[in-house]
């Protein structure tokens, strides 16, 4: 689950997650994808670049 907003500046970033993930999985350069999505601030970029989906790993413990 990607956070809805950037922890530092508060910009909404969750709307860019699905497109970023699809394009990254297709082999595009992550930096170029973030530029195309309009995420130019370092804080917002790191939110998407460093995110790891762990929800599937946590589901058995619910």
Swiss-Prot record:
Domain of life per record: Archaea
Record-listed Zn(2+) binding positions: 6, 9, 43-44
Keywords: Cytoplasm, DNA-directed RNA polymerase, Metal-binding, Nucleotidyltransferase, Transcription, Transferase, Zinc
Class in the EC hierarchy, top level: transferase
GO molecular function, one term: DNA-directed RNA polymerase activity
Cofactor(s) essential for the protein: Zn(2+)
InterPro entries attached to this UniProt entry: RNA_pol_su_RPB10, RNA_pol_suN_Zn-BS, RPABC5/Rpb10
Gene3D superfamilies: Homeodomain-like
Entry-linked SUPFAM superfamilies: RNA polymerase subunit RPB10 (SSF46924)
Pfam families per record: RNA_pol_N
Similarity-based family: Belongs to the archaeal Rpo10/eukaryotic RPB10 RNA polymerase subunit family.
Subunit structure, as described in the record: Part of the RNA polymerase complex.
Protein role: DNA-dependent RNA polymerase (RNAP) catalyzes the transcription of DNA into RNA using the four ribonucleoside triphosphates as substrates.
The protein's name in its UniProt record: DNA-directed RNA polymerase subunit Rpo10
Organism: Methanosphaerula palustris (strain ATCC BAA-1556 / DSM 19958 / E1-9c)
């Amino acid at each position: 689950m990607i956070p809805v907003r950037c922890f530092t500046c508060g910009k909404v970033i969750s709307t860019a997650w699905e497109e970023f993930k699809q394009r990254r999985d297709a082999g595009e350069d992550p930096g170029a994808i973030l530029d195309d999505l309009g995420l130019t601030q370092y804080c917002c970029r790191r939110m998407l670049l460093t995110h790891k989906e762990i929800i599937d790993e946590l589901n058995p413990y619910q």
